[in-house]
Amino acid sequence: MESPPLTRPDAAATTAASSEAGLKMAGLVEPEIVAACEQAVLRLYHALDRADYATVLAQFAAEGTWQRGPALLRGRQQILAALEKRSATQVIRHVASNFLWSARDGQEVMAAFYLTVYHSDAGAPVALPVAIDRPFLAGDAACRLTCEADGRWRIRHMAFDRVFEFPA
């Protein structure tokens, strides 16, 4: 379910030069922008866990990039191609927490957060709940979101660095 767009009066004023300028943070992010951006990130992971790839893709800008392991996926087509290779029998949950938000300008924000992943794949469909003894992995995630012309905040770039792996 899509949330209504958060319209910014200066949404059309973004230029490629201003949105791609250096990584200097401009400061705090307005609460309504934090809410809209956090919903985009959480909506992505909720959809990813349920193999709802159309909703996952809708959270990315058309030219968005996603660093997934060693692969840098560029654009929605590459992202979809990678997602379609995921196991249809896995049960997975991504838990995003401890968000820190910074503004670059009125049209772009950065987020740093923790991501813990719980995973099981028996190779065949299973009944819930699935018994596991530990998380699959945990680490640091980051993303950059931009306010697009339609007033929605979408992910321009997302990356994840593994910090903890849990032996089987």
Show the residue positions of the predicted features.
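Short beta-strand edge/turn micro-motifs at domain boundaries
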Residues: E2-P9, E108-M110, D133-A168
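Charge-dense, low-complexity intrinsically disordered segments
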Residues: G27, P31, L73, I132
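Soluble or luminal CAZymes and related metallo-dependent hydrolases
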Residues: A36, R93, L137
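Outer-membrane beta-barrel domain signature
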Residues: A88, A131-I132
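Short, surface-exposed loop/helix-turn segments at secondary-structure junctions
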Residues: G123-A131
